[in-house]
Amino acid sequence: MKAIWLFVLFAWFSPAFSAGGEALSFPSNLQHGQAPAVVILFSLPDCAYCEKVRQQSLRHIHADPGYRGRVAVYEIDFSDSKRSFTWFDGNRYTGKSLAGPLNVKFSPTVMVFNAKGTAAGKPLLGASLPEF
């Protein structure tokens, strides 16, 4: 788990990865524990910094077959009050209803969880860009 967290930190600050595109996968049910580590990008619509984090860091982990089954990467719009998903504890949430309990107030926020839903370290806030 520590190695995955270090990779996320490295990738977060690395300009080496770039790929464009839409949002990452939206979780439907996190209770099933599809991977030992779960990385979640909490984003807002039209957030340019969220797109940078998505492009420069998380899309690489999401697409790399070497991480399949080891790391799941998702994106949740924490202003969304319509789409719901099952959290690790079995309760249903929307991005908006989960933001409060997790203290997500800033976009982008990246959090890493183990398969049981325990946070693996402090959230990463913001982006590693000179203008940020």
Q: Over which residues does each language-model region extend?
A:
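Sec-dependent signal peptide recognition
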Residues: M1-V8
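N-terminal "domain-start" segment that seeds a small globular fold
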Residues: F10, S14-Q31
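Short active-site neighborhood of thiol/selenol oxidoreductases, capturing the structured segment around
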Residues: G33-C47
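Hydrophobic beta-strand anchors of alpha/beta hydrolase catalytic cores
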Residues: V39-I40, V73, V110
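Short pre-active-site segment immediately N-terminal to redox-active cysteine/selenocysteine motifs
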Residues: S43-C47, R54, F106
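Typically the conserved alpha-helix immediately C-terminal to a functionally engaged Cys/Sec
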Residues: E51-G66
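Thiol-based oxidoreductase modules, predominantly thioredoxin-like and allied folds used
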Residues: G66-Y93
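Non-catalytic, surface beta->alpha helical segment in thiol-disulfide oxidoreductase systems
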Residues: G100-P101, K105-F132
